[in-house]
């Protein structure tokens, strides 16, 4: 079967007149376990970072190399999250919006403009704009995606040490065959998202 041609998106032109621009991205909407993690990053135009790209398109080695560089060179960065309990109460979309609000609120410098990956934006006290495929088109969003991805992966590796039978270090909590098999054999843990279908089925509440 012929491979679908990839659609080239035009470079995103950042609107003029904004001095402090934050990029925001999330990691962890799809997993069955753990927090949804977001990051907000304001880059320093005088300290460029080479090699920024969507965290999912970078090797783990490259992400881990860029992670401290972003932390050191950025004017400001912050992480926001929502717990599995909050996800179950709010739903994953609303929880992601809240986590993004928390990330932006955590910045030590207030941005003039916030650029958010995707097509939805949370309510924020400053101007914000959604950017489709922003993690590929906007350096600030790329940096945020790397921060969020590395932090969430580290948290899954820590959870793996607590519950090695689930294999969280490998699948990062995503709904893989190995994760389903572990749930079937060992049940669910406190950090599982009880509102997600496979977890509900394992608990017999669907």
UniProtKB/Swiss-Prot annotation:
Keywords: Cytoplasm, Endonuclease, Hydrolase, Manganese, Metal-binding, Nuclease. Its cofactor is Mn(2+); Mg(2+). A divalent metal cation binds at residues 25-26, 117. Residues 19-206 form the RNase H type-2 domain. One of its GO terms (biological process) is mismatch repair. GO terms for cellular component: cytoplasm; ribonuclease H2 complex. SUPFAM superfamilies: Ribonuclease H-like. PANTHER family: RIBONUCLEASE H2 SUBUNIT A, RIBONUCLEASE HII. Endonuclease that specifically degrades the RNA of RNA-DNA hybrids. This is Ribonuclease HII. It comes from Vibrio cholerae serotype O1 (strain ATCC 39315 / El Tor Inaba N16961).
């Amino acid at each position: 079967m012929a491979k679908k041609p990839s659609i080239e998106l035009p470079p995103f032109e950042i609107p003029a007149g904004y001095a402090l621009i934050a990029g925001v991205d999330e990691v962890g909407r799809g997993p069955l376990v753990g927090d949804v993690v977001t990051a907000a990053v304001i880059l320093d135009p005088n300290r460029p970072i080479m090699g920024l790209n969507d965290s999912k398109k970078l090797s783990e080695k490259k992400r881990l190399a860029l992670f401290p560089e972003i932390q050191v060179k950025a004017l400001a960065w912050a992480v926001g999250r929502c717990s599995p309990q909050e996800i179950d109460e709010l739903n994953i979309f609303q929880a992601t919006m809240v986590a993004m609000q928390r990330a932006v609120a955590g910045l030590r410098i207030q941005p003039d403009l916030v650029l958010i990956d995707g097509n939805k934006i949370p309510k924020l006290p400053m101007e914000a704009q959604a950017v489709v495929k922003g993690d590929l088109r906007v350096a600030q969003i790329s940096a945020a995606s790397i921060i969020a991805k590395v932090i969430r992966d580290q948290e899954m590796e820590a959870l793996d040490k607590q519950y090695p039978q689930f294999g969280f270090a490998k699948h990062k909590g995503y709904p893989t065959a190995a994760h389903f098999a572990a749930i079937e054999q060992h049940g669910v843990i406190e950090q599982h998202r009880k509102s997600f279908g496979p977890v509900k089925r394992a608990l017999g509440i669907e």
